């Protein structure tokens, strides 16, 4: 049976929970789309998060890796198109690290594109009635760090395994403490992940539909 690795993060920036992990953990050891799903919680820490990710990849030998992270302020499931080779932390990570303008991989490419069918995932989510869009930036914090590190590692291993990153909004419980911020219920995020797992396994070539942005 094929394996899909789904990662999420521990809470950060004073939050009591991270909705990415709340949504991901319930999928651990479940069968979705004919594949076994394994879940891994990453530290919200530069470098350490990649060490944990690489160990999980080595242990589980997945066919697909989907990394998930919280992005408070996002209004929908944001499927990331690209990761850039820079750390520029507006806040410190969970161990007090705050790198500014440092490369994730010395002499690595400026960017990597997701190897998941990004637009097909968005299309499938919308068909399922779940708000979704293509995102053109994963930021410059630990989420982008993990996405770039993931894609670099998979490229070094011959691009046999496909991977990418997805940002999700606050949970309603978090949004209650951040008045005016959008949110998405955790069960809906979990349902979205199931849709994306199935689509990622079923489709390797992306669809040619618009997903660009003006700014």
From Swiss-Prot:
Annotated Gene Ontology cellular component terms: cytosol
Domain of life: Bacteria
CDD domains per the UniProt record, alphabetical: Peptidase_C15 (cd00501)
Keywords: Cytoplasm, Hydrolase, Protease, Thiol protease
GO molecular function: pyroglutamyl-peptidase activity
Main location group: cytoplasm
Pfam entry (one): Peptidase_C15
Active-site residues, record numbering mapped to chain: 80, 143, 167
Recorded family membership: Belongs to the peptidase C15 family.
NCBIfam families membership: PRK13197.1, pyro_pdase
Function: Removes 5-oxoproline from various penultimate amino acid residues except L-proline.
PANTHER family in the record: PROTEASE FAMILY C15 PYROGLUTAMYL-PEPTIDASE I-RELATED, PYROGLUTAMYL-PEPTIDASE I
The protein's name in its UniProt record: Pyrrolidone-carboxylate peptidase
Species: Pectobacterium carotovorum subsp. carotovorum (strain PC1)
Gene that specifies this protein: pcp
